[in-house]
């Protein structure tokens, strides 16, 4: 269980850093600033600008649906915790190594995408001509040359590792 907790902490730090560098957090939390992604959603789906619709969406999707998902996602961790008296085995070591590899792969993919998007928008803001991947609008180098969604694949495999931890400990 301690091993799993360490890996979850590493993964959580990575997720927090990735969100923070995109200005996902503000030290002025009392101003009630919202996640930048909601602004984009409201622009694309204008009905969400109606206060009662947004409140219902907030209640049903953000509060209820997402909390339900979090509960379901945590079930493998609960199963692993219930089997916490079992000693660390070779399968735990392999699962841990695999999970670290997927966390690192996800970090590399996110860094590549972040650097690409930052450079692309700097070029656009400076009225530069876009060429290559920037003209296409998406990255095709690094991990992105192997897969269109290396960060998503890594994220899904991290969740598979949680499941494997639950099997290993029970």
Residue ranges and their predicted role:
Residues 1-170:
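Membrane-anchoring alpha-helices and their flanking helix-loop junctions
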């Amino acid at each position: 269980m301690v091993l799993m907790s360490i890996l979850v902490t590493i993964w959580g730090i990575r997720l927090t850093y990735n969100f923070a560098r995109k200005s996902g957090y503000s030290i002025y939390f009392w101003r009630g600033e919202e996640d930048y992604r909601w602004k984009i959603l409201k622009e694309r789906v204008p009905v969400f600008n109606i206060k009662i619709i947004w409140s219902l969406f907030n209640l049903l999707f953000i509060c209820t649906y997402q909390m339900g998902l979090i509960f379901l996602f945590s079930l493998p961790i609960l199963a692993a915790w219930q089997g916490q008296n079992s000693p660390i085995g070779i399968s735990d070591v392999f699962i841990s190594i695999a999970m670290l590899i997927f966390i690192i792969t996800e970090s590399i993919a996110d860094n590549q995408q972040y650097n690409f998007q930052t450079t692309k928008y700097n070029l656009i803001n400076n009225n530069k001509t876009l060429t290559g991947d920037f003209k296409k609008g998406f990255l095709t180098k690094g991990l992105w040359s192997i897969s269109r969604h290396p960060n998503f694949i890594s994220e899904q495999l991290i969740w598979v590792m949680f499941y494997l931890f639950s099997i290993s400990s029970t």
